[in-house]
Design a protein with these regions (language model features):
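Basic, Lys/Arg-enriched alpha-helical interface segments
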Residues: 1-86, 95-98, 106-125
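Conserved catalytic cores of phosphodiester-cleaving nucleases, focusing on short active-site segments
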Residues: 101
């Protein structure tokens, strides 16, 4: 069984009352692996910065499905993705808290979602 802990996600300062956290699974923040993977790719880093801007201004009313959407076809209804171009950031939305889980690419989306769903089984706050 995975062990979950959270820490404040300091890269986001939401203007609308949402609080963003890192979701650590067994002391690992999966999102860090994605950031490491794109560190030498300026286009992907730019898209990630765009997603951080979306997170800063996030409110359910503001963002269209082209930037933020619920992940369909999984048992959990609280898994969402922020997206810009081919870059995805997967989160769990439990208002007013948003837990950043992982990042990925559109081309690997199905595989990423399956992996995330498996790894967050049992996560509740």
């Amino acid at each position: 069984m995975n062990r979950f802990t959270t820490e404040l996600f300091e890269l986001v300062n939401n203007e609308n009352g949402y609080i963003f956290y890192k979701l650590l699974i067994n002391d690992n923040f999966l999102f860090d692996y994605f950031v490491e993977r794109i560190k030498n790719s300026p286009p992907e880093r730019t898209r990630l910065k765009t997603i951080f801007a979306y997170m800063d201004m996030f409110s359910k009313v503001l963002l269209p499905k082209t930037k933020f959407r619920n992940i369909k076809g999984v048992d959990r209804k609280d898994i969402f993705e922020f997206k810009s171009g081919n870059v995805r950031v997967y989160v769990i939305l439990q208002c007013p808290h948003i837990y950043v889980v992982a990042g990925g690419f559109k081309t690997e989306q199905d595989k990423d979602i399956k992996r995330i769903v498996q790894q967050i089984k049992g996560f509740q706050l």
